[in-house]
């Protein structure tokens, strides 16, 4: 990677998240917008990326081919769909480019592909790039160690009507943080739906509930409920810029790293708390 500004490429530049990633890249010192990508056939191809994001002219035009911009970036930032992200991952691995991956909804094979690629390139892969959410994950580990064995644990998440995966990647990360603190595997204790005559709640399970409505950016609550009291830890996002800023900050953090798989807690040094 270059010693000067880290040059980033933004996938899905015309989407809601893509435009805010462009804004964040243009605003953060030490980062340079090197490329912006959209799908083949998009009406946005050829547009100026800065103007597309409402940030003024940059001279970076939206392209559809990674090959065409392979010399213009050091780190690829991707918040698109799993199938597209995995294609981008293969390209970045082949060409020695770092990646920041905020895409959610990967199956186990997709996650394994990311782990495999990290042997050759540096990757920050996180379900949520908000500072607050990652502090919350640390708090959940602490709460679970104290209260997790005797309380009923539920995770409730809400997002906008356009979100296509459920539960959210952040909700799953919350469940994994709690399960790990309790020396459990989330696959063995998660309950994702309840309908009809379910019987009494099974002790030791982690329940998930999902809301999809309107323009909710993202709300997540973990509940540790006992008889007579309950603890709720909640994070509410009011703007996607919190995720965009965290992702671009992660790209800058990757400077000088040749390979390895990291998450936002590494970027924020939360693992040492």
UniProtKB/Swiss-Prot annotation:
EC top class named in words: oxidoreductase
Xref: PROSITE patterns: DAPB (PS01298)
Subcellular location: Cytoplasm
Pathway: Amino-acid biosynthesis; L-lysine biosynthesis via DAP pathway; (S)-tetrahydrodipicolinate from L-aspartate: step 4/4
A molecular function (GO) term: NAD binding
GO biological process, one term: diaminopimelate biosynthetic process
Binding site for (S)-2,3,4,5-tetrahydrodipicolinate: 160, 169-170
Any Pfam family hit: DapB_N
Active site: 159, 163
Function: Catalyzes the conversion of 4-hydroxy-tetrahydrodipicolinate (HTPA) to tetrahydrodipicolinate.
Protein name, as recorded: 4-hydroxy-tetrahydrodipicolinate reductase
Organism this protein belongs to: Shigella sonnei (strain Ss046)
Encoding gene (name): dapB
